[in-house]
Amino acid sequence: MNKKIIILIYLIFIKSIVGQNPVWIGGSGCNLFTDSSCWSPSTSPLTTDIVTMGVDSTQTVVDGDITITTLINNNLTLGGVEMSSTISLEIIDTSLIVSGAFSMATNSRLSLSLSDSYANSLVSGSATRNAVNVLMNLQSMQTLMVGSSFTMTGNSVLDVNRSISTINGVFTMNDDTSLFMYSKQNGDSKFTVGNSVLNDASSLNFQGQSFIFFNQTNLPSGLVLNDQSKIVAIDADNVKISGVVTLNDQSSIQLTSSRLYLDSLVTATTSSILVNNSTLSILQSIPTTFSPASAVFKGSVFTIKSNCTIQSPITMIDSVYSFNQSHTLASQFTGSNVYMIMDAAILNAGNYYDCSGCSLSMRNSIANFDSYENQGDLILSSSKLNSNAPITSNTGSIFGYYGELNQALTVESGSLGVYNEKTRLFVNGNVIVESGAKIQFYLSSPLDFSWLNTSGSLDVQSGTIIEIYVYIEILNNGSMEVIKTSNGFVTPLSTDNVKLYTYDPDNDVITDFSTTGGCEYSISITNTSVLVHTDYACQQAIITLGTDGISKGSLAGISVSMVALACFVSLGVWWKTSKKNDQRNDSQVLTNFSQNKSDDIDVERKL
């Protein structure tokens, strides 16, 4: 039979130290400040008393509910709290200040919350109580303040709903204890502790927006998960955990339709990570080793901001993998329909990269593979891809502004370049474009246009079309060398496989220039080059086949080494995302959270 004691008080913070003998509280229908049957040995606890909740004046265990809510001029500051038996304590719209330790026994429950009506009033202004001016807003409201340690045992539960609480000491969860953090409206749940340890099968559970802050004044600090303990987030929109999160033993992180942002993550080789339709971001640039027994991402985003060595298998399906700085794969990476984003990064993949239908987008970056086969989009913006074997592309496109491939390239299907993006690509070797594939170049002006420069030959096989798209509003005359080869063309080019189009990007209209009757644009094909000319004083279309290449053209003065150096030069424009309509920007990657968060460029895209 549940018995309920309503404790109506309002709390202010005062400095106190733990002392006196234990005091007990229990019974039902009591006014704690007048009825001696509720307290033993006195009718009111001192600020230094250690209070045991869940027993009556004879120290007999009493199951029941205790509710602490606001009342002017009644204040409760205690030296310590021990919740025994199956007692349930609710702290609503006020603060409980404990200078010493707080412990929860088996099956006890502590709920910290602000009511909807009170939360709304807190947002609106300020008030004065007990001659203390309190800024009545959600950021200053302390629901629970514990000066020493907080320990949970048995099956005890801590509910934090739109609460702002602080534990200055160690927060320990044992057995099957659970912490639930969630927020319905008008603010986040915030929980600040010195450091935290989870043991046995205890769990942190998140829903809505929550923030746990671990004070790093005394290292080591942060969140330590032992045994089979876990972090669980379900439909948690914006969960932030500061400090170092350490997964020991068989502990785990389990995310479903949630976003979890960590400062730093340390993983044992027996831990596990499961991310489903969620985001997991590691924000600090501290070098790290990622080594859980398993890590699976489905329909999710995984972001790492630091130098990282991947020493455990990773499986990604329909997901985004984004990283900065240096990444080394020392274990198998298996993916399907993965969009990998490198921003000022170096990837050492070796022979551990196995990704089907995957895209790689690089900005100011270098990627090193034993072998590489493109099965999606390969976007090289001031970036270089190195392979120990010739590179193949059997689907999608290869494009980007100032990209370099260190090996010969075979395009089996898809396209080299795209009609609506400028592509400038160096290939150190021969280029083969097989039947059915395309070469596409976008020419926006004689000073800024696409080109292919290969140190070998270009083999455009039967059925392959070179499509050149000229921006419809080019107004100045000039020549543009769109293809430059050192060893010429394996199969002579002609107007049968080199086509000229005009392109109106504003309306996305493409017109075959051969059908317009115009002569503003013309093509020259030599033994080693393909050039496009503009002439607004023309009388007729000019298509010429020559025998001599040009020794100095629009590519003169551009060094292959520029691409490698460009990995350390920031460009003002990155790649566009219009080519992947199934992805969307998510620019909510944590503001005002950690020192590095302002650099956290939007990388989330929902596939």
UniProtKB/Swiss-Prot annotation:
Keywords of the record: Glycoprotein, Membrane, Secreted, Signal, Transmembrane, Transmembrane helix
Residue positions the entry lists as glycosylated: 75, 161, 215, 276-277, 307, 324, 453, 477, 527
Membrane topology listed for this record: Single-pass type I membrane protein
GO biological process assignments: sorocarp development
Additional record remark: According to PubMed:15947191, it is secreted in the conditioned medium. However, prediction tools clearly predict a transmembrane domain. In some conditions, it may be cleaved and secreted in the conditioned medium, which would explain the discrepancy.
Ranges facing Extracellular side: 20-554
Signal peptide: 1-19
UniProt source species: Dictyostelium discoideum (Social amoeba)
Protein's name in the database: Discoidin-inducing complex subunit B
Alphabetical list of InterPro entries matching this protein: QS_Complex_Regulator (IPR053370)
